[in-house]
Amino acid sequence: MIFQSFILGNLVSLCMKIINSVVVVGLYYGFLTTFSIGPSYLFLLRARVMEEGEEGTEKKVSATTGFITGQLMMFISIYYAPLHLALGRPHTITVLALPYLLFHFFWNNHKHFFDYGSTNRNSMRNLSIQCVFLNNLIFQLFNHFILPSSMLVRLVNIYMFRCNNKMLFVTSSFVGWLIGHILFMKWVGLVLVWIQQNNSIRSNKYLMSELRNFMVRIFSILLFITCVYYLGRIPSPILTKKLKETEERGESEEERDVEKTSETKGTKQEQEGSTEEDPSPSLFSEEKEDPEKIDFKETRYKNKPVYETYYLDVDRNQENSKLEIFKEKKELLWFEKPLVTILFDYKRWNRPFRYIKNDKFENAVKNEMSQYFFHTCESDGKKRISFTYPPSLSTFFEMIQRKMSLFTTDKLYSDELYNNWSYTNEQKRKNLNNKLINIIKDLDKALDSKFLILDVLEKRPRLCHDNTKKKYLPKVYDPFLNGAYRGQIKKRFSLSIKDKVSIQNYIERGWINKIHGLFLIINYLEFEEKKPFHRIDKRLLSTEMNFFLNLINEFNGKPTSSLNFKKFYLLPEHKQLRINLEGREKKIRFLFERFLTDPNNKTIRKQAIGIKEIRKKIPQWSYKLIDDLEQEEGENEEALGTDSQIRSRKCKRVLIFNHELENTNGYSNSQDTNNNDERDDIALIRYSQQSDFRRDIIKGSMRAQRRKTVIWKTFQANVHSLPFLDRIDKDVYFSFDMLRPIKKKFQHWLWKKPEFKISDYREKKSKDKKKEEEKRRENARIEIAETWDSIVVAQVIRGFVLVIQSILRKYIILPSLIIVKNIGRILLFQFPEWSEDVKDWKREVHVNCTYNGVQLAEKEFPKNWLIDGIQIKILFPFRLKPWHKSKLKLRNNYKDPMKKKEQQNDFCFLTVWGMETELPFGSPRKQLSFFEPIFKELKKRLIKLKKKCFRILIILKERTKLFLNVSKERKKWVIKNIVFLKKIIKELSKMNPILLVGLREIELYELSESKKEKNLIIDNELIHEPSINIQSTNWTTFSLTKKKIQDLTNRTNTTINQIQKISKDNKKGFLSPHINISSNKMSYNDKRLELPKNILQLLKRRNVRLIRKSNYFIKFFIERIYRNIFLFISNIPKINAQLFFYFFESLKKIVNKTSSYNNYIYNNERNQEKIDKTNQKITQFISTIKESLSNINNKNLETFCNLSYLSQAYVFYKLSQSRGFNFFNLYKLRLRSVFQYNGAFLFLKNEIKDYFLGTQKIFHSELRHKNIPNYEINQWKNCLRGYYQNNLSQSRLVPQKGINIVNQHSIAQNNHLNKYDSYEKNPLINSEKKNVKKKYRYDLLSYNFINYEDKKNSSIYGLPLQVNNNQEIFYNYTEHKRKLFNMLVGIPINNYLVEDNIIDIKNNPDRKNFDWIILNFCLRKKMDIRAWINMDTDANSNKYTKPRANNYQIIDKIDNKDLFYPTIHQNQEMNPSKKKLFDWMRMNEEILSCPISNLELWFFPEFLILYTSYKIKPWYIPIKFLLLNLNVNENASGNKNKKTTGKKKRDIFISIFSNEKKYLELEKQNQVEKEYGIKTDFESTLSNQEKDIEENYAVSKMKKNKKQSRTNMEAEFDFLLKRYLLFQLRWDDSLNKKMIDNIKVYCSLLRPINLREITIASIQRGEINLDLLMIQKNFILTELIKKGILLIEPVRLSRKNEGQFIMYQTIGISLVHKSKHTINQRYREKGLVDTKNFDEFISKHQKMTENRDKNHYDLFVPETILSPRHRRELRILICFNSRNRNGIPSNAFFCNENKVKSPVLNKSKINQNNIIRLKFFLWPNYRLEDFACMNRYWFDTNNGSRFSMVRIHMYPQFKNELKRVLKKSEIRIDFISRTILHI
């Protein structure tokens, strides 16, 4: 088996070697190139198909030879550079191709062009064989490939860089191509043989002859098409567009040198007319390669060519830049230019590149720089090709090779290189090991001798620049330091520096090179003698000369010049002098000769020495191009006289206002003609919604070479490339992602419960349908518009048709209709309506508009309306009506159905078919029918006529029947009635009226004493008894009358008893709100109460009169009744008589109840009906409260009683019965916020406003009760005052601003009821833990109010928290419920989808990002966010149960991620009255003006700040670290107030504003620090500056006055700008349509004379939105944001993080291992280093996986003693140990698990130990930026994102070690690539 596997392994390795060999790869790539078919195959196939005989055989051989020779030349050109340059340049190929094609066509068509014949031959017949050879050879060199792509040929070129033996590869690839070519030709031969042997083809001889005759023509046509295709890809030099050069560069016409140096020198000299920075403006700028070259820039100066010339200033023999007007043009004539430049402009955009503008350079940079640079380098002791080798190093290496004579050119072999490399590594490793051993020995000695350990440890080396004074470089500039100390070095050199120390530093950096550069200029001074005089600025010259002489003295070591430069004046004061060039040369040469001589007076250098410097050349285009938009705007001065060269998106100029048409009188000012340029037209640019095929391509470039684009929609905005179709958002029809909607539906179903259904679901659904319908119509309208716009001649046709339709409508159709209508009215004998119709016809106005609907003048046509399009708008369109006075004649029965539409839109647009539409290209609206109102009126009149006829018949029939019936029984009936009335009179006369009225008087007196019966709820309605049957025979019996009287008295007694009971209750007193005594007018409610009081007093006075005159009154009343009865009997039928007797019977009852009491009751009932109507909404509101706060099951409830089961209706009923509470006052509180709005209820009476907006009083001051309510009542009123400003239909009780219920109810708690068994006797403590926060407070107040007198040990009325003093409301933070980040604690926000809360983080630990879909709130309902931001945390509220030392909030067992957030250890007393509510991100203030950036977001407007802060840095806030850990140590001290011991953990949202003002107070912290000694430990990733700002904010106390809040806001804003400077402003999406509508109205308002009236009318109609009008000139940004016009949205920033945070991002995401630890164990260790015991040393990075039960936090590694740099070096050397290349490195920390023996480890910690090993293997402290450096410099990658595991194959030992460690720790193999991606 071993032998077989050995043989099998050898076979596999042999096969792999053969496959990877150069020969096989060359054969494969050469075979692939066969499939790239070009036009040369046409000549080859033609020779094999057409030619026959001996000559045909020769032609076949010559064609094949030429074909193979051409391909061989192409392969050789890959290896041979001169041939590649000759054949690869485009102008070379074009020069060969064009003449040869012409020759070829005239060769075949010498007699007749396109007239071919198979037998015609020319006189050059003998050269035909050579021509066939040349055809195949040359066309093979042309390299134009048809199928499938030229990429197959380039594969050979690409692979050339990877093989070592290039000649063998070229040979093998040619052989492979030859094999493929032979196979192809064999296949063609087989096809020809099949054609010849086919009987159907052979039988038709005529077909064969015709095919042979036309074969030449077919091949010529194919060749012509191929050449045209080829010329289309490379345009001819004559037909392409020549771009105008804006700059001629003498130094290099296409490139500009950008020097890479460590310093930035010089200043930018801006001269008049210059826009380019001077390349060499100062004395010591970098020297160019050719100093004689002068940069010219052509500008325009008064229509003359002006060149800005940069001359050498004084110290470099060069003056300042100066404008010179050249008299003669320097443009070369056409024959002076080379031929290649004329034919082939290599500076032109030949390929369809995009013009990439750059602000740093004036011209665009060519996008031709490759990021790859190939060069050989040593890696792992072997030479390898690095494709990201620095070009500067390669150039420097070549320079050294040329210059150094002693440079050895002997190449070492690979084995020698590897041996040297391994030897040096081994020596380094030994040195480091010895150093480590010595350090450990020194540590042992230090421990024995009890010296400080820190003195023994290795220290960081520092760079010293002054040995005598021992001065070190600053940490920022020290190269030995790394990490946070290093920074970007910005070195600048200023000419004004005169300090000797700084000059010395600059000289040390090599300023001698600049002095050498001075000599280079002296030799070329002859080139500037054309202009002998130049101007010199005195100040600039003196400054530079002074510096120059000081520099010379420093360089020479001693002062060589005796010149005192302060007294040396080259120029007089305040003047400019012309100095001769020769004199200037002599003076400067004198200075050079003075200082550049040695003591022996020998000149050091007499000749200039050129110093080459490493530069990087950036290729630039020599053109400065503009697009169409820049040309339209004309902002660039240079763009005014030039045309646009960039083909931008097709746009149209929509004219809004034209200055020429402003003067309607035709008067034109003469000055206006001179200032035509200043008076431009006001226009907008509209882009058509069609595909953009221009794509910003430069004119003249080859459009055929652009990427293949695809259009799959009818109207597609952007053209997309095929490979990138999957990157764009898919349409609905093309989307295959079916899981997304299913997932959303499943989530909604999972979280939905019936009690949380939205009530207006149907309304929302209907609104969504309307929106979809509007969108659909809008899309259809846009498609129609784009269809008209896309067709070529469509706009012209449409414009003429619209004008014709407008003329026809206005002057032909409408007048004819008016004539026909009025003639019809005359024929129908009605008055004609000529005047009315003509008036309406004249009112209709046709206005010409632009294509978008922006209207112009009435008779004005838009510019280019035949090309751009036109719209015709009809103002006040004519409606043909059958009559005009419909309101008077028809009594408002006819209503015009178009009336509302006319009021809204009194205009329309004309369509091509003459129809009317509301919007351009919209659907035509329904026309009003002329005959429809006529038919309606006729129908109504017919119905009325029918009703009248039937009514007459029915009445006649009934009256006849009634007359007959009444006449028969009239006599009997009258006699019976008379007898009945007599008996009634007798009974009434017997009764004593004085007694009856006296009883009522006493009762009335008692009622009038109470005076407060208005708001009582009394169910005392009148009971209407059925009428008595008058025809009954027993009606005269006395017993019936007596029974009725008895029932009446019983009812009266019950009513009196109720009134007495209520009056007794009211004598005890009840709460009455107060009335403003100082008010002169009575309130509206007081007047309502005064009215019944006055009535009662009036009735009381009249009762005495009625007692005296009752007999006379009754007699008079009865006689009056008799008289009326006899009068009506003769006139009414029987039914009316029955109704009358029913009325009489009720009248008798009223007589029996003759008292003012009934009047009072009646008034009370009317008032109570009003109260009931007003209280319907209150009861509805109570029901919603009941629904929202009920349905809470408490499983921990042990007894029968639970306060949550008591209904809220019962609570309000008890409140209504108690004193001091009435519903009218409650309703008043509800309406108060409504009346506080200034813009509503303008027409309400002042009394009503005074009542609701004044102080809360109902009764008059005389009626006010004197009793003062107790505290609980006021407390309950304060609670309710915050609730009744909420208009939500399903709202829960959320507190409003200004109420701190926690501080209020703490007063009501009884501090003396300290019962030790309260925890057992109050099971509600356990039950109420799970209640929501707001409901708990609400229940506490309600039951405290209802039963405030009975606070005993009963389980129902016992308050949960009334026992423990200084105790706050307890909320169980550790309950296992779904919480919103375990912070919201079940707070009742209205729109939760579930009853409990939203997320269960404990069961969902896999989330890595913050998902805002969780907060699925509705935007319509604004809630105060403070309710769930209140972080009033407590531990176990009961002191007498078993206390726990550490009551942490266990959020989740999160893997090690929370590492770099600040922890604040603070001692704080548990006093609820002193605790402040935590204000997170200033959310306690109501954000009313907060704009909603995106209406699709599913949360409140208050969440906008949260969302924007998350958008700024989503990587910075994972889902589980939106919480900041504040550890608060609370120490026990004091006797009275017992404090709990332990740490209280608060989880608070991390805020970018760091707003902790309301929570941490400065005074409080100072006091506690003095008492208990707080230890504050910040371990954050914030920088020092940000940390200081956060501390200042955290300890600052927020005052309530406005000044303090304003300063805090400014400070916060400054802090925000310091951290996040990049914000973008964007328009609100909803504003676009409003702005366009406003612009349209503005256009119509620009010309009218009566502008004010029309503007007011348009504002009243709502056409102009005043909110969008910019009335102020200088609008503040905050006002724009408040108005919702601009929205601030952050731009994602590239945040520069420190090493710890990079480690957190990379390791925290990648290392998802099994051993996860909770947050509550993160920050409990005391310190990092304990100097007493070294065994307890804890490294900073070991906090992640340490075992916190013991002090052995990690595997102890001696390497940690070394510095990080040496530690890293040692590990790398161990990993790449040369002796163990094929095995596992012999490292104690990377060995197998069995070898690791430590008392700390056990079997359950294997994964943890593997992670520790991996951490130690990577770098200490997870410094993964070092890992990126290793990636860059070891693996030859310049970009970290290109790192992959493939490149680790070069280092097998490293790869194996990683695999082994990663496999054991269950980490993904792609860890390294993931980590680099996150750096």
Swiss-Prot record:
Keywords from the named record: Chloroplast, Membrane, Plastid, Plastid inner membrane, Protein transport, Transmembrane, Transmembrane helix, Transport
Main location: plastid
Region ranges (Disordered): 243-291
Cellular location(s): Plastid, Chloroplast inner membrane
Recorded GO CC terms: chloroplast inner membrane
GO biological process: protein transport
Transmembrane segments: 18-38, 67-87, 90-110, 127-147, 175-195, 218-238
Record's compositionally biased regions (Basic and acidic residues): 257-271
Keyword Transmembrane attributed: yes
Record membrane topology: Multi-pass membrane protein
Function, as annotated: Involved in protein precursor import into chloroplasts. May be part of an intermediate translocation complex acting as a protein-conducting channel at the inner envelope.
Record family assignment: Belongs to the TIC214 family.
PANTHER family: PROTEIN TIC 214, PROTEIN TIC 214-RELATED
Summary of subunit composition and partner proteins: Part of the Tic complex.
UniProt protein name: Protein TIC 214
Species of origin: Morus indica
Gene behind this protein: TIC214
